[in-house]
């Protein structure tokens, strides 16, 4: 009997490894399959990719939730995924199992764009030491530069006045408010990151916003899902460059802004902005290979703050103005409260919010109804967890369906209608139901929540203090349905802004 040579052993070794892996997989499946969440039967190779409408993900998930319950499974290509719906299941996932559900799955298209160990930013970074370091830095630095203080409030108020001036220049004319809203919220973020603001007609600002919108469009829909499910496609010459051209252009714009900031940075002086503070940390971390403070990660952190902190606020404000022209009775009541609490002379302040329950309720209802981030960024389990008595194994992608709480019929009296009374009790006091969670919760909650709340209140009250908004003469009322992308934006619309008579 001949002995097998080294060459002959290779097929045997490969077969043995595959056999062991299959036995292990079978054992694992036997352990948890009976308690794994139900879901639609996946197709070979593609899984459920073509069974979910990525152009209207919330409605697809709503139908699946009605069929399979608050916790159900999907198979996106070969990636197992569990969708979490409803307040009870969401709290279990985000809070009870928070330590085991705070991680992010790898996203191949962002790895292609430079997100890698040591330069993963904050939003997409895996849950670990680098993420904690950058989260602490971002929160503390935003606080140092005025978050929650009068200094930042004054800056936002000044920007709100610039926004009002832009509306005044076009008063009485049909206008699309979105470009002006984008510019104002961009300037707030730019003030924190670069200590600068741009004039609304600055060609650089206009180009940057156009590229940012293009970049966000590129990472929503079917194409990025296919690229993430089959990352080998990213190796096809020019395919990824063409599909992600806006992303690369936006990163290049930010890189140029950082270079400008770096040339004027004086390490001896107190930091002027977040970029200066990060550069100081880079200097401190020299020689420490474990540190996440480096030039590449600075670019990723800045990209995260711009992407997450700018269009989310401007899109919510766009919803607010559209809903005001659709509900003039609500608009008049907000203006009445503004006149009673603030008047027409002084600017709104955050301290006024506690005395304006109806305005506060309207802003929160805009967030609930607009539902601009219906599906939160995916998580991945770092250990086996249990949610609603279902066993979800380690390595499963979790998709938090935030819309399932904001439109829950058991929580909201009129979930599909704009109804500010959702946030008022019988005595007219402001109340916030537990299911209102637009900024998520737990370890991965939005780090810019306080800034977003400040911007929404100050911009909204400044605008309604100065103007009355209406549907332009001769135009039909806009639809109150959303347009789905990476954010849910209101359907395109125009409005007329009329300067209010201060003697009313």
Curated annotation (Swiss-Prot):
InterPro entries: Cyt_P450, Cyt_P450_CS, Cyt_P450_E_grp-I, Cyt_P450_E_grp-I_CYP2D-like, Cyt_P450_sf, Cytochrome_P450_fam2. It is a peripheral membrane protein. Belongs to the cytochrome P450 family. GO terms for cellular component: endoplasmic reticulum membrane. Cytochromes P450 are a group of heme-thiolate monooxygenases. In liver microsomes, this enzyme is involved in an NADPH-dependent electron transport pathway. It oxidizes a variety of structurally unrelated compounds, including steroids, fatty acids, and xenobiotics. Its cofactor is heme. The modification Phosphoserine is found at residue 249. It catalyses: an organic molecule + reduced [NADPH--hemoprotein reductase] + O2 = an alcohol + oxidized [NADPH--hemoprotein reductase] + H2O + H(+). Its EC number is 1.14.14.1. One of its GO terms (molecular function) is oxidoreductase activity, acting on paired donors, with incorporation or reduction of molecular oxygen, reduced flavin or flavoprotein as one donor, and incorporation of one atom of oxygen. Coiled coil: none annotated. The keyword Iron applies. This is Cytochrome P450 2D9. PANTHER family: CYTOCHROME P450 508A4-RELATED, CYTOCHROME P450-RELATED.
